[in-house]
Amino acid sequence: MERLNKKVQPVVRLEHARKAFGGNRVLNDISLSVMPGEVVAIIGPSGGGKSTLLRCMTLLERLDGGGLWYGGFPAGEDGELAVARPAGGEPGGKAVYGDKGVLAQARQRFGLVFQNFNLFPHMSVMRNIMDAPLVVQKRDRAEVERQARALVQKMGLAGCEDKVPCQLSGGQQQRASIARALAMNPQVLYFDEPTSALDPELTGEVLKVLKQLAAEDTTMIVVTHEMAFARDVADRVVFMDGGVIVEEGAAEQVMDAPVHERTREFLSRFSG
């Protein structure tokens, strides 16, 4: 925990979030704040709401109720950008979203790495990395290219610059996806089960990259089934089940001495 930046303002803050699909309540009164430099691992059984939580925080889905704020902005209350506010200021009230400009600002503050890579299949590794900084951020091409080449080296992809995704291994594709997300200089990186589509050997490649990013104080929120990663790399672990946060706390506490019976039951399935 010594790594954590002691700034008061969270990078992202979610309050009393609610989300349902039809009659199925997927998120039920979820509140979560993540500080600069913090690594948060979200664990739990399939169908517990983990991926929906990430999709709502990254604006791929809209909350039904509650609020979502991103920090680090020059305007707004306490330097936060209100992406969604609860109607009437009531906790858990209907989520009222900002306009397109607000959502566009928020999207530039985070990167998202999917479990299935989601690289553009017709683009080379370099073009995949450079596309969003050039098109969305309108940055200088020479600067973007320098950054992309540095990220290729950092991700261990030297020699793959001109390859398209089908010419890469799964681990290489996921590392290219991480490089693409980093190219936008995000304040926080989201990972949705980044190793679930990989075999064990390639999983190790990607986890090594995540450990490196954590050591560099990269703010990360990681939905994962990799319990060793949650224990050894995360600062905080959140255990979700049934659309609620059952338990959260320091990684070593939740993983090695969980308080709730449901957490203990879940983790026992991963013990040797």
Task: Enumerate the language-model features and the residues they cover.
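A short, compositionally biased domain-edge/stem linker segment
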Residues: 1-4
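ABC family nucleotide-binding domain
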Residues: 7-251
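C-terminal boundary and immediately downstream tail of ABC-type ATPase nucleotide-binding domains
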Residues: 242, 248, 252-272
